[in-house]
Amino acid sequence: LSAEIMERLKPHLQLAETVGLLVSQLAGGHVKEMELRLQGEFASHPSQPLVIAALKGLLSAGLGDSINFVNASLEAKARGIQVLEVKDESSRDFAGGSLQITTRGDQGSRSVTGAVFADGDLRITSIDAFPVNVTPSSHMLFTRHRDMPGIIGHLGSLLGEHNVNIASMQVGRKIVRGDAVMVLSIDDPIPADLLQTITAIEGIQ
């Protein structure tokens, strides 16, 4: 691809890599299949660079800086990850289209959708089909929980007790008192022992 096209694709490649990294961390275990769905305007872009960027993000969660745009496809193949690609130009969920990555593996299926807004900002727009509006950041905490009183307050208090500062928070749900997701952007990484305490909170899955 020409340098001009690659420059135009730059925010879309960043989104694909970011979404790949996020969905990999949510999936846990061994990922056997990655499905990349390009919707709306995204479907009109060359797909191969987006596939490679998504794989780079997906694999970098476990392999770090050793994964790059040159070896991402080879590493995915070596690990037996099947790659599926779907294009849907008719989708009009966002003006600039969207990109969804779904993984399937040992611990089930997880999906994250993102979009590039007009000003070039990257946004996460859904997690496992729960609607959110999240700007990706360096340190994020995701929870899947029951939509019931007390859980958000309990988690916020727990983070405060451990001097973890919350920069922003988003909650997505489909029905009242059903399941929900919460996304917190925080200033620092969460220690492993605190993460274990969080997962033990009643109502957090």
Which residues are covered by each model-predicted region?
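A conserved regulatory-domain signal marking ACT and ACT-like small-molecule sensing domains
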Residues: 2-205
